[in-house]
Amino acid sequence: MGIEIQTKPFGKMQVSERQILSFPEGLLGFEEYKKFALIEEEEESVFKWLQSTEEVDLAFVVIPPSLFKKEYKPLIPEQELLGIGINEIKESLTLVIVTVPGEDPSMMTANTQGPILINKETLIGKQFISRNESHSVREKIFESAAVEIG
């Protein structure tokens, strides 16, 4: 059964209940927004949208970090992972927020220091802070990439 939401990139659309994610603590800087829909831009695209179901103007472009950083391993204490009901990062859907500068999309960056982990069973997510010092809030995707962005 679908739920109708208003989105920033696509206007009004139907999403399935399995696309609605709960973030009990919100996202960093947006703690008041707790529900987001994970929307695929196009089937063949690596990009997805994390769209607030509570605020139409709040949407983030996200991708799995493994697409441009094969050995991506955020360092997050196990006790924090238990907060979303997982024991290991590999049990989650891992995404990072992408910033695409309008003037030069080839300069897009990803926040590898603030990964979003989602429990695939419960659909509860959280944005964590990776303790891995090699991660950055503005990692250039194309410099790290072994990806072909469609």
UniProtKB/Swiss-Prot annotation:
Pfam families per record? FliW
The UniProt keyword set, sorted, is:
Bacterial flagellum biogenesis, Chaperone, Cytoplasm, Translation regulation
What does the UniProt entry say about where the protein is found?
Answer: Cytoplasm
Keyword Repressor in record? no
Its BP terms in the Gene Ontology are: bacterial-type flagellum assembly; regulation of translation
Q: Which GO terms describe its cellular component?
A: cytoplasm
Query: Is Cytoplasm found in the keyword set?
Result: yes
Q: Where are the transmembrane segments?
A: none
Known role: Acts as an anti-CsrA protein, binds CsrA and prevents it from repressing translation of its target genes, one of which is flagellin. Binds to flagellin and participates in the assembly of the flagellum.
The record's annotation in NCBIfam families points to: PRK13285.1-1 (NF009793)
The protein's assembly and partners = Interacts with translational regulator CsrA and flagellin(s).
Family recorded in the similarity comment:
Belongs to the FliW family.
Q: What is this protein called?
A: Flagellar assembly factor FliW
**Which organism does this sequence originate in?**
Leptospira interrogans serogroup Icterohaemorrhagiae serovar copenhageni (strain Fiocruz L1-130)
Provide the taxonomic classification: Bacteria, Pseudomonadati, Spirochaetota, Spirochaetia, Leptospirales
Q: Which gene encodes it?
A: fliW
